[in-house]
Amino acid sequence: MRIAILSQGPELYSTKRLVEAAQLRGHEVHVINPLECYMNINMRQSSIHIGGRELPTFDAVIPRIGASITFYGSAVLRQFEMMGVYALNDSVGISRSRDKLRSMQLMSRRGIGLPITGFANKPSDIPDLIDMVGGAPLVIKLLEGTQGIGVVLAETRKAAESVIEAFMGLKANIMVQEYIKEANGADIRCFVLGDKVIAAMKRQAMPGEFRSNLHRGGTASLVKLTPEERSVAIRAAKTMGLNVAGVDLLRSNHGPVIMEVNSSPGLEGIEGATTKDVAGAIIEFVEKNVTKVKKVTQAQG
């Protein structure tokens, strides 16, 4: 097969591992920066170009689209889809998962466990918003944040009011969530592929830090999932419409709660913690599913 990997970073661990795994299985791989692509959209023969040349035909595309380029990256991916190329994760699923509030709304409708979440627009609603999520301590999140950036733990009501008011004053979109104290600064990353969790790791925050992201100094270790955790992770990925997802959950007193569904999960932490060939499993999944793609894709725009 000829496989395109949409990535701005050919030197990144995840990209290199996918290239390596695909080449080991005899495939031709091209790493393409989506920001360098431009599109010809017409009723006869749509195409994608880079540097004055039309890209060749691909059998499959693996999107590794960063959060900062979601809009343009999704547009490029959608163009591949409209040209009949199999997308490991499609543009609709990626767009859903990148909108944190929409993700929460979709999962709540499916009855998936979540932290109590509040969203408001007016400063006059702040007191009731805080009460809705159970009061302080609580977590305040920028909807556009990634890797723990833009996430604040407000330990007192006064601090919560001040931070929320400041974000609102900056016209920043935020959501407010209950603080799951019993998680003790740890979360679980479930790596979902198709209808299975193929790997999982526990991420523990540094002392004095509540964010467990590995980019913020958290440590990763093996973890054994309960059947309920495995099931809820798969349901969360399916709700987003993703074939590949990093589903982050916390162990709360009332069962697992989903914090986020990541459509472009990193491979370094999960492969390091579990010693599993996650990249190889992804390429194998593409091989099995690429023949099922229809000439007219299911992308809804």
Curated annotation (Swiss-Prot):
Q: Name one GO cellular component term.
A: cytoplasm
GO molecular function list: ATP binding; metal ion binding; ribosomal S6-glutamic acid ligase activity
What InterPro entries does the annotation carry? ATP-grasp, ATP-grasp_RimK-type, ATP_grasp_subdomain_1, RimK, Rimk_N, Rp_bS6_RimK/Lys_biosynth_LsyX
Q: Which Gene3D superfamilies match?
A: 3.40.50.20, ATP-grasp fold, A domain, ATP-grasp fold, B domain
Picking any one GO biological process from the record gives:
SOS response
Which of this chain's residues are annotated to bind Mg(2+) 1?
248, 260
Q: How is the cofactor bound?
A: Binds 2 magnesium or manganese ions per subunit.
Domain of life where this protein originates:
Bacteria
What are its cofactors?
Mg(2+); Mn(2+)
Which sites bind Mn(2+) 1?
248, 260
* Enzyme Commission number(s): 6.3.2.-
- Residues where ATP binds: 141, 178-179, 187, 211-213
| TM stretches of this protein | none
Tell me the protein family, please: Belongs to the RimK family.
Q: Which PANTHER family match?
A: RIBOSOMAL PROTEIN BS6--L-GLUTAMATE LIGASE, RIBOSOMAL PROTEIN S6 MODIFICATION PROTEIN
What protein name applies here?
Probable alpha-L-glutamate ligase 2
The species this protein belongs to is Shewanella sp. (strain W3-18-1)
Phylogenetic lineage? Bacteria, Pseudomonadati, Pseudomonadota, Gammaproteobacteria, Alteromonadales
Chain's gene name: rimK2
